[in-house]
C-alpha cells in the first residue's frame, strides 16, 4: 500500500500485491500473478478515510518517480472497486504477507469492514516480512522503485523466498536440515 496516513483509516493511493509460494524460487523473474490499482482519493474521503500532514510532508521527501506514480491522476478507480478486485485476487490465498504486522493488513481490513465486504483471509493467515527479514538472514532483495506498491510487494516476496530457501538448506547443530514450517504448507 501507499497511503496518506499511518493510521488504520489511512487514505489509500495505490495497492500492489503479488501471489507467490514462499517455498518456491520462481518469482525472481517477476513472473507471478500481480495486482495493482491506483485509488481515487476522493472515494476514500467519502467513507471517512484520514490524511495526515506529516505523511504528506514525508511524500515530499520521496523520489519524483515514486511521487508521480502515487499521485498521478490517470487510471484511478473507486476504493469500493479496488477492494472488490483485491478481494477476488486474495481469495483462497494460504498466507497474506505484509511489510509490517500493523500497517497494510489493518488498513485493508478497515476498508473491507467500512464498505461491508468480508475480509478474504483469517487472522492466522497473516504474515509479516519485517519479522522474517530481521532474523539475520540476508533476504537478497532486488533493487526496485521504493514506495511503488507493486514493486515493493514483488521485492518483499523475493526476499521471503530467499530467506525460506536459506532456512531450508541450513543445518542444525547435529547436522540435520532445518525443516521450517513443515506443517504450515
Where are these regions (language model features)?
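Conserved non-catalytic scaffold segment of RNase H-like nuclease domains
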Residues: 1-98
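Short, function-defining helix-loop hinge/capping sites that tune catalysis or transport
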Residues: 8-10, 136, 160
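Substrate-recognition/cap helix-loop segment adjacent to the acidic, metal-dependent catalytic center
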Residues: 87-90, 102-123
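Acidic, Mg2+-coordinating catalytic module of metal-dependent nucleases/exonucleases
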Residues: 95-102, 106-107, 138-185
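Gly/Ser/Thr-rich active-site cleft segment
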Residues: 109, 115, 127-132, 150
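Short, flexible loop segments at boundaries between secondary-structure elements
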Residues: 120-140
